[in-house]
């Protein structure tokens, strides 16, 4: 089984999204989002090819967690590296600097 690695940027992105969701919608919404993230990560670990490749870079896959958040990752035989969790409400061109 591949090792799951979150980059520093991905950790910061998740922290920011968790804090935003909790402040705007409450702890229950934060927990629901965390469960969706965990479910998505489990699916990626089982089958990293499950999600489509990014239009910006064919070596990077994207997993839509919710319509407001997308997780970007790469993988090798040994590991899955989560690069970023992008808030899709941002200007779309901003993702280019993250992946």
Predicted regions span which residues?
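Arg/Lys-rich, positively charged N-terminal/basic patches that mediate binding to nucleic acids
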Residues: 1-34
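Conserved N-terminal glycine/acidic-rich loop preference
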Residues: 9-17, 51, 68-70, 92-94
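Residue-level recognition of specific faces of alpha-helices
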Residues: 13, 40-43, 62, 84
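Conserved amphipathic alpha-helical interaction elements at protein-protein interfaces in regulatory
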Residues: 23, 43-46
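Solvent-exposed interaction patches of small proteins and small membrane subunits
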Residues: 32, 57, 93-96
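Basic/aromatic recognition patch in beta-strand/loop cores that engages polyanionic ligands
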Residues: 38-39, 46, 50-79
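Enriched for short, Lys/Arg-rich terminal
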Residues: 69-70, 74-99
């Amino acid at each position: 089984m591949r090792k799951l690695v979150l980059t520093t940027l991905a950790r910061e992105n998740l922290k920011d999204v968790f804090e935003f969701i909790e402040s705007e919608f409450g702890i229950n919404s934060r927990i629901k989002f965390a469960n969706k993230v965990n479910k998505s990560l489990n699916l990626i670990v089982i089958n990293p090819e499950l999600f489509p490749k990014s239009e910006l870079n064919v070596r990077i896959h994207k997993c839509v967690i919710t319509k407001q958040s997308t997780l970007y990752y790469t993988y090798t035989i040994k590991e899955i590296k989560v690069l970023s969790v992008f808030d899709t409400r941002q200007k779309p061109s901003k993702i280019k600097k993250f992946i």
